[in-house]
C-alpha cells in the first residue's frame, strides 16, 4: 500500500447477519482467519460497536485473534449501510503503533464510498 505504509496485510471481511460471523473477502497478504464471530477479536468488536478500532499493540488487546504471529498493530474500520455493518476493512502491521488518526480518516472515507456498493 502506497499511502498507508508498513501494512503487512490488508483485506475485507464481509458480514453474514444470519450466522453473525464475518467471512474473509478480498485481501492482499498471506492467508488469514477465514471466519470471525461477531464480538470476537478486533474485527468482531468493530462490528458490535459499529466503530473503528485502532490498536497500537495487539498483544495488549484483550481477545485479539492472532491470524499472524508477526502482527503488532491493527486498524479495523466498519463498512456501514443504513446503520447496519455489512463488512470491515482490516489492516495489519508488523510494527507497533503503525496506524494514525490520519489513517483512520482515510479508511473511514473509503468505507463510506464502499458502503454505497451494498
Tell me the role of every PLM-derived stretch.
Residues 4, 67-71:
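Short loop/turn motifs at secondary-structure junctions and domain boundaries
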Residues 73-80:
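A short, aliphatic-rich beta-strand micro-motif
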Residues 9, 76, 88:
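Short hydrophobic/aromatic beta-strand element in the GNAT-like acyltransferase core
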Residues 1-4, 45, 113-117:
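Amphipathic alpha-helical regulatory segments at dimerization interfaces
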Residues 93-118:
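Juxtadomain coupling helices with adjacent low-complexity linkers
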Residues 15-67:
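Regulatory sensory and allosteric helical modules in signal-transduction proteins
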Residues 1-23:
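Helix-loop-beta substructure at the N-terminus of cytosolic sensory domains
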Residues 80-93:
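Sensory-domain boundary capping and coupling elements
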